[in-house]
């Protein structure tokens, strides 16, 4: 396989273009650098930038059927072998504070043993971990270890978000035990986040498993073993998501039951109040519509006696309800 010159991957508006030094570090790519399997290149692009879009559409370093995928037309996690290279689409947690974490960010990459091209539109937060290791000189030394480190960082961020959702569910369950109902829409949003994670992380787990089983020339047995460990770890996260989705269904039923019981208690209370005041309401209405005049209206103690009668009547009804165990 021929070496690539640094000038062949010179993209002015690239997010960064680095040359791996083979010892865990990087240096900025220069035009006179030689790119080979011992010193692979990592070119990271935002495919919406004009120079990056033109380079993706015109460079002879990429197969024709890879260009559209790197330009944003592939969204679900997948892996495809393209001759000597491999096209991979992955999803990561959104680190933007203006958007929800479950609005996952897509990262697309094409790589072989000497050349890595990764593209994105929104920032891929998990790449910061890999970039930090490379800048400190403790990062990947070749393309195989780079891919393993990237997948490991993506899985770490996904696992952290799954753990956050799990903690929210535990808090929600504790509040329900205290008869505290969550705000409207809270449980629906939580369930949606779990379903979105399940939708994209399941095929991503399959991508990891396939990378672990594929005999890619630039991945060693140790790389494949680590990739299988990452796939297993994400699989355990998916099991946790499935359990959380089931628990949200149970909590939805519990919330509906709590609200129904609360409504039943209020209805029962209003019914008892109506039963207590119904006799007194009947008497006051009867006296008020008496066409021949209100009985005792001319007696100065008539109103007082009527009030005492109402109090006794209400007390009698209340006592009867209490003895009947309605109160």
From Swiss-Prot:
**One GO term of the cellular component aspect?**
plasma membrane
The protein's location, in the record's own words, is: Cell inner membrane
What Gene3D superfamilies does the record tag this protein with?
CorA soluble domain-like (3.30.460.20), Magnesium transport protein CorA, transmembrane region (1.20.58.340)
Major subcellular location class: membrane
Q: Give the membrane topology, semicolon-separated if more than one.
A: Multi-pass membrane protein
**Alphabetical UniProt keywords:** Cell inner membrane, Cell membrane, Ion transport, Membrane, Transmembrane, Transmembrane helix, Transport, Zinc
Q: Spell out which residues lie on the membrane's Cytoplasmic side.
A: 1-273, 322-327
Periplasmic face of the membrane: 295-300
Which chemical reaction does it catalyze? Zn(2+)(out) + H(+)(out) = Zn(2+)(in) + H(+)(in)
What sections of the protein cross the membrane?
274-294, 301-321
Q: Which GO MF term does the entry hold, naming one?
A: zinc ion transmembrane transporter activity
Q: What does this protein do?
A: Zinc transporter. Acts as a Zn(2+):proton symporter, which likely mediates zinc ion uptake.
Q: Which family does it belong to?
A: Belongs to the CorA metal ion transporter (MIT) (TC 1.A.35) family.
PANTHER family referenced in this protein's UniProt entry, alphabetically: CORA FAMILY METAL ION TRANSPORTER (EUROFUNG), ZINC TRANSPORT PROTEIN ZNTB
From the Swiss-Prot or TrEMBL record, give the protein name. Zinc transport protein ZntB
What organism, scientifically named, is this protein from? Salmonella newport (strain SL254)
Designated gene of the protein: zntB
